[in-house]
């Protein structure tokens, strides 16, 4: 919708160089899975698979705003808008290049690992993982926004818990939005919940959601893992334009997505050689074919779409599940709207995540 953070348009005042870093995709698990080092092109897909044996999770699963998101890309944009408990992606430990005020190009090693003295040595040692555990330092710097859960509970504060270009969470690579060249970041991981449950909430009164939000944030012992609002119009758009990606994830699994993107790139490069074929041919082809697939959304979701204008997808974990069940059952006895427990977590997550893909 906005062009994203990549170069967009033709009105720049200088030449532009675009570097695809997706093949620099190494991920190093350190401190028994409690932290990771993600290189420029490493993805959340790859990280999720690496952390599973440790019983840990990355900051985001799949990606809060797009399928196939990179770790570094999310950090550079302070991503994680739907994450209530974890907040925005943030770290004070990274390896990056910048232009100084004097116009000099320098490499800054703030990642907390002794990798050498000159840029070539530092980058080579990191990419090839030529460092030992005693070279990893643990400075008094954050590798996540570990105070966000306190800010988000302050529902009467004059400022929002988070917003674009929040100076509290702009630090080197974090929130840099492409103004520096990030080679690697160091991030905390999170203990995977034993149980998770998605609550699908519907109402025709926006104020109902305001009451729910304030109650959950200020009164619940356990914060939601995530929460995402959908208007009925957004629901319809996601249903139509995200159907192709959903079908792939549902039938082939999320691990197939990187292969799908690689195949799509090859198709688009081939299509560019034929003037009769449209730009982004693979996207248009997939969406066209998806029209022949049966409705992929559960009937109960469709019923809520027809009945309610406002929709809210809330994911709770562990003790928060029972807490939310009791709250919603009591709340809707005297308030307009209703809720149900979703048994189709993937489809619900896709409907609000995929809307940002295009």
Regions found by a protein language model. Give the residues of each.
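Noncatalytic alpha-helical scaffold of FAD-dependent oxidoreductases
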Residues: 1-358
